[in-house]
């Protein structure tokens, strides 16, 4: 559509935007390649069926065990999501310009598409090539960060040549799994938060051709390699107005526009978000409605990334900041988005995972828990449960997919402190009143009524029950003319949870906060009764013409109401709703109500299926505690229920449910063996002048492509020499005397470095949470300087990763190395080493290029299974050497977790003293799964999943301890582990993970 005609059309219909719209008002779009996925002002449409895209993000490369992906995705599905989103990771798959790896272990992500099909979920595929994601250089391959490929994320031919092989291969891999080819991949994102379509003010529409041509090239390449599904984009904020065809049809604009938002800040350091969100106020909602109406009025309002939590930066609070986006955040903000007509939303993150190895950007440490609904250890939490209530509602609220906003900011009757937005389906007249505090940052208890318009007139509701309550940072969606199956609610002040059809009869589930009252009207019902009162009170049935008004108060428990036409209504409080599940019996992402079953009680229900004769309901899932009641609502033909393959004893109730009990493990019954039997060896022989570095790379470049030039020569930027991650070692030589050295070293936030002259320690930069450069003048006064021969300076530096976005080219290495001397300021030569393998190759293709750094222990494979440490001495990391240096500790511990249990295990690292100047790396069966810097803080627990840990077998545990200070003060690290959660589960965490844990080979010896 031409820009001029679009805006003329928009102006013509402008007054309709906040009013009911007829079916013909808004055009239906597709991309011209398929009509299977279409969209309009209201929602996406899949094969003609309107669809609320409810998604959560997870990153397969942050949980590098393919056997665990099904566990995570089953939990996503169980929470009511119909979609999940994934990023790829360019560097993970493209370790050097000549290698693409989509085959080894977790590098092969096609299993995820098979799981999506099996579970009945759509996929939003986000291949980058740049993804940000708090990943090292935003997932750029680090060989790209030298400056030789230009400024990146533009139309530079050098950059284009770099991304083309990866981009083409990804498209060809994904193409067979598209919805248009019988798969479940629904949309394909181009780039990520590239808000640079325009030069200057977006309203002037002056194209930024560098970005425009880049986007156009990415789009054309994806199409040429088989991608036919719609393209989407995610604008980074409310200000850049980039890539919407409604705003401008051309200049690289994509099919479906989206905009990302993190109203409670994407990091625990809240001040970082001030420039985007303004000064932080807890629970301060943001208006998106006007933005989408202006920028993408003929498209669904889409939030490709909406806040699911926050990452924890170096030095952040121990355990992250879940209090910034708790369960109440999910309740309030997700409902408020519905009130703004959002019909496509993906939570970032639904499961965060771990920055194992050197995946992380400098802004974040090892944990990428993100305070997500599914925790880093794969266990679900209260935010998950609250999110599930919302997800189950979305699944059955079909009329939400087409609504107009009738009004917003309306004051509730009798209480000016409560306001609501009214959205209404123009076809069915179903309405949704989304209520919040007038000041969303205020969590006071407020009682109120609303004036609701229904198909049978206007009512001040509730009519008979106690008033509606907002208690705390909460929102409620009050429905009117809510259709489910063959029934309808004229209204309900209790929130709708779910709907199922069993034996051709409707079952409706409602919920309310514990102790509150609700009122609903069942149209066409004549009478009702209480079949089971589990915490109910003040139940009343009041005929109103052809309808029946019902009042009920609900304490902890679940109550069952039965009506004259066979309708059953379950009413439960929040605590019982948290343990209420609606497994789907089909792989249809639309989850039809007649293909679901209600289950209440277990910690998790993963799947449900009926036997071929319909007499048995087979359930799988998780449960804990010594005894858990389970209640199911299956067809009358079901007389037997199995749980994880075992028949459970049940009793049939008068209202046709089956009740039984489950048994599970007591957490205190699981004990882990003590981690002991440590052996140790020196991991820094490079400090010694006798060390042979003849095989190291000569650091002799006198120029660099990097736009940031060094202060001294030669160039000592690590990426220029083919090393990129972890610890790097520089050896500089000089002749004659000097009294000291000035060093300026850059390694990213929280990095550090230490230096030795001729084998003697001269000092360290200990690092801090935010500075990325450390400048020191180190004296040689206490060490021996060879005035008549060669002196060797060793600099061991940490590299916490490359910066993101436009700062990915920021160099890592030594910016300035100047001798303090009357005769010479310069070193005669430099050499460097890092990760084992030739520069820009991966010696360990299974674990991948980001797995390990350049410490002596890593290069020689001391962290790997099968390494022979028989000649090492016994020593404990709890008391490290008094000398500054690096010591590697290693032990083997066997686990024997009982089968039938899913167990979360975390390592605990405790420094002595608590702020010891130590840099510690934790290795488990060859994987680096913890970076512990007690001087900076604050992560002390490190979850390690099965597949990395062998739950039934031996585990090689390694610990690299870099002491940055010398002296008599005792320093050490106490290493422990613990079971944090345990469930009886259908998911089996014991499997053969040998292919994920390749062992030591003598190839490593050449890197000594």
Swiss-Prot record:
Disulfide bonds: 268-321
Family from the record: Belongs to the glycosyl hydrolase 35 family.
A GO CC term assigned to this protein in UniProt: extracellular region
Alphabetical list of SUPFAM superfamilies matching this protein: (Trans)glycosidases (SSF51445), Beta-galactosidase LacA, domain 3 (SSF117100), Galactose-binding domain-like (SSF49785), Glycosyl hydrolase domain (SSF51011)
Glycosylated sites: 20, 23, 108, 208, 269, 453, 594, 624, 681, 703, 782, 788, 816, 826, 879
Protein name according to UniProt: Probable beta-galactosidase B
Subcellular location: Secreted
Encoding gene per record: lacB
Assigned EC number: 3.2.1.23
Alphabetic keyword roster: Carbohydrate metabolism, Disulfide bond, Glycoprotein, Glycosidase, Hydrolase, Polysaccharide degradation, Secreted, Signal
Database matches in Pfam families: BetaGal_ABD2 (PF13364), BetaGal_dom2 (PF10435), BetaGal_dom3 (PF13363), Glyco_hydro_35 (PF01301)
Annotated organism of origin: Sclerotinia sclerotiorum (strain ATCC 18683 / 1980 / Ss-1)
GO-annotated molecular function: beta-galactosidase activity
Residues of the active site: 193 (proton donor), 305 (nucleophile)
Binding site for substrate: 87, 132-134, 192, 262, 370
Catalyzed reaction equations: Hydrolysis of terminal non-reducing beta-D-galactose residues in beta-D-galactosides
Signal peptide start and end residues: 1-18
Main enzyme class: hydrolase
């Amino acid at each position: 559509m031409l820009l001029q005609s679009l805006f003329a059309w928009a102006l013509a219909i402008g007054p309709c935007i906040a009013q009911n719209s007829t079916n013909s008002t808004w055009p239906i779009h597709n991309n011209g390649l398929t009509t299977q996925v279409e969209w309009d002002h209201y929602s996406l449409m899949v094969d003609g069926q309107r669809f609320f895209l409810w998604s959560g993000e997870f990153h397969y490369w942050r949980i590098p065990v393919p056997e665990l992906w099904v566990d995570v995705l089953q939990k996503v599905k169980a929470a009511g999501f119909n979609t999940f989103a994934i990023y790829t990771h360019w560097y993970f798959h493209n370790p050097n310009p000549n290698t693409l790896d989509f085959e080894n272990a977790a590098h092969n992500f096609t299993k995820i598409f098979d799981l999506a099909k099996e579970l009945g979920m759509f996929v939003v595929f986000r291949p980058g090539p740049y993804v940000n994601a708090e990943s090292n250089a935003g997932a750029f391959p680090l060989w790209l960060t030298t400056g030789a490929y230009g400024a990146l994320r533009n139309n530079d031919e050098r950059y284009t040549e770099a991304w083309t092989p990866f981009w083409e291969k990804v498209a060809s891999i994904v193409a067979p799994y598209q919805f248009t080819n019988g798969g479940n991949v629904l949309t394909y994102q181009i780039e990520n938060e590239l808000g640079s379509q325009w030069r200057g003010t977006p309203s002037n529409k002056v194209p930024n051709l560098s970005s425009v041509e880049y986007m156009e090239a990415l789009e054309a390449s994806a199409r040429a390699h088989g991608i036919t599904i719609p393209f989407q984009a995610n604008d980074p904020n409310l200000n850049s107005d980039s890539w919407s065809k409604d705003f401008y049809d051309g200049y690289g604009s994509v099919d479906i526009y989206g905009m990302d938002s993190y109203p409670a800040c994407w990091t625990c350091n809240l001040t970082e978000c001030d420039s985007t969100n303004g000064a932080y106020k807890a629970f301060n909602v943001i208006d998106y409605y006007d933005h989408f109406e202006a920028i993408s009025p003929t498209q669904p309002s889409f939030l490709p990334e909406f806040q699911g939590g926050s990452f924890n930066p170096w030095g952040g609070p121990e355990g992250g900041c879940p209090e910034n986006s708790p369960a109440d955040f999910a309740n309030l903000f997700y409902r408020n988005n519905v009130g703004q007509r959002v019909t496509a939303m993906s939570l970032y993150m639904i499961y965060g995972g771990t920055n194992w190895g050197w995946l992380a950007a400098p802004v974040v440490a090892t944990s990428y828990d993100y305070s997500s609904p599914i925790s880093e250890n794969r266990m679900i939490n209260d935010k998950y449960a609250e999110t599930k209530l919302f997800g189950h509602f979305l699944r059955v609220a079909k009329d939400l997919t087409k609504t107009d906003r009738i009004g917003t900011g309306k004051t509730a009757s009798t209480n000016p402190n409560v306001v609501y937005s009214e959205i209404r389906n123009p076809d069915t007249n179903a309405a949704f009143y989304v209520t919040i505090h007038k000041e969303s940052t205020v969590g006071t208890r407020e009682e109120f009524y609303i004036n609701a318009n229904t198909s049978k007139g206007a009512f001040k509701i509730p009519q008979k029950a106690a008033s509606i309550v907002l208690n705390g940072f909460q929102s409620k969606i009050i429905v009117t003319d809510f259709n489910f199956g063959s029934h309808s609610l004229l209204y309900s002040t209790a929130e709708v949870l779910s709907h199922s059809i069993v034996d051709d009869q409707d079952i409706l589930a409602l919920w309310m906060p514990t102790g509150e009252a609700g009122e609903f009207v069942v149209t066409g019902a004549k009478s009702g009764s209480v079949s089971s009162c589990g915490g109910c009170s003040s139940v009343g049935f009041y005929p109103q013409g052809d309808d029946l008004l019902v009042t009920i108060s609900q304490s902890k428990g679940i109550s069952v109401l039965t009506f004259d036409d066979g309708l059953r209504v379950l009413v439960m409080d929040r605590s019982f709703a948290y343990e209420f599940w609606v497994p789907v019996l089909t792989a249809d992402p639309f989850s039809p109500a007649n293909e679901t079953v209600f289950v209440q009680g277990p910690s998790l229900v993963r799947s449900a299926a009926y036997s071929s004769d319909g007499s048995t309901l087979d359930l799988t899932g998780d449960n804990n505690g010594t005894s858990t009641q389970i209640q199911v609502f299956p067809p009358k033909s079901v007389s037997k229920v199995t749980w994880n393959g075992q028949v459970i004893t049940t009793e049939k109730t008068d209202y046709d449910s089956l009740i039984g009990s489950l048994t599970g493990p007591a957490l205190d019954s699981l004990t882990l063996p003590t981690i002991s039997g440590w052996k140790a060896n020196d991991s820094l022989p490079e400090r010694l002048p006798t060390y042979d570095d003849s095989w190291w790379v000569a650091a002799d470049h006198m120029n660099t492509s990097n736009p940031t030039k060094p202060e001294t020569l030669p160039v000592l930027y690590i990426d220029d020499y083919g090393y990129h991650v972890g610890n790097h070692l520089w050896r500089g030589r000089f002749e004659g005397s000097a009294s000291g050295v000035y060093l300026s070293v850059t390694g990213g936030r929280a990095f550090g470095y230490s230096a030795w002259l001729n084998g003697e320690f001269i000092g360290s930069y200990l690092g801090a949470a935010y500075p990325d450069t450390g400048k020191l003048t180190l004296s040689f006064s206490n060490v021996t300087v060879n005035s008549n021969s060669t002196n060797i300076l060793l600099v061991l530096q940490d590299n916490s990763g490359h910066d993101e976005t436009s700062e990915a080219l920021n160099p890592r290495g030594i910016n300035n190395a100047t001798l303090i001397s009357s005769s010479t300021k310069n070193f005669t030569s430099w050499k460097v080493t890092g990760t084992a393998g030739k520069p820009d190759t991966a010696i360990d293709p299974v674990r991948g290029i980001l797995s390990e750094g350049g410490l002596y222990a890593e290069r020689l494979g001391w962290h790997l299974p099968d390494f022979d440490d028989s000649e090492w001495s016994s020593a404990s990391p709890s008391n490290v050497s008094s000398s500054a240096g690096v010591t590697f500790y290693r032990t083997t511990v066997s686990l024997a977790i009982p089968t039938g249990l899913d167990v979360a295990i975390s390592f605990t690292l405790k420094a002595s003293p608590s702020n010891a100047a130590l840099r510690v790396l934790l290795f488990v069966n060859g994987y680096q799964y913890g970076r512990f810097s007690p001087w900076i803080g604050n992560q002390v627990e490190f979850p390690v999943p099965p597949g990395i840990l062998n739950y039934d077998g031996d585990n090689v545990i390694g610990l690299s301890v870099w002491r940055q200070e010398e002296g008599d003060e005792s320093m050490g690290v106490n290493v422990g582990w613990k079971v944090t959660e345990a469930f009886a589960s259908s998911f089996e965490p014991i499997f053969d993970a040998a292919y994920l844990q390749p062992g030591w080979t003598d190839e490593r010896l050449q890197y000594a």
